[in-house]
Amino acid sequence: MFSFKLSLTLSLNSLAFCMASKKFFTLQEANSFIPQLLEWVPQIQKLATSLNKDFPDIKNAREKAKWSGGSEQGVSYLNAVLKYNNLMHKVEEMGCEVKGIREGLIDFPSIREGREVYLCWRMPEKEILFWHDLNTGFAGRKPI
């Protein structure tokens, strides 16, 4: 009984901390990030396409790496992965959530009428024009 109470208390405290540390955006705050996203998202999209298409030798390199083999594409691939991860980290560090990089779809947690929702942005929109409930996704977008 004691360990269950302690575990439950720790879990609830962790949940409360996560909720308290989660960033919520006003429409104005979220819109202030759009110019940066308009620059970064196309770069991320290009890198994602490149990682999926331009490195056919990587699968073989991964298999050979088990036996100390390698690939001429290895260094280029790792550089692309590092750039991709760096840009994704910058976007996520803002506090927004990447929902689909191929579509250029990013959500900003927000509070609307006392409940948590997402301000929904999609490339190449110049500002956030839509929002949706947490469980409806892009299909549930509503005009602001």
Tell where the protein language model's regions lie, with residue ranges.
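Cationic, low-complexity basic patches in intrinsically disordered or flexible, solvent-exposed regions
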Residues: 6
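Glycine-rich, aromatic-bearing surface loops/beta-hairpins
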Residues: 89, 93-144
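A structural signal for alpha-helical segments
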Residues: 25, 32, 46, 68, ...
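Amphipathic coiled-coil alpha-helices
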Residues: 40, 47, 54, 61, ...
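Interaction interfaces in information-processing and related assembly proteins
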Residues: 65-68, 79, 83-89, 100, ...
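Long, hydrophobic N-terminal alpha-helical segment
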Residues: 2, 14-61
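Heptad-repeat coiled-coil alpha-helices
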Residues: 53, 57-60, 64-67, 93, ...
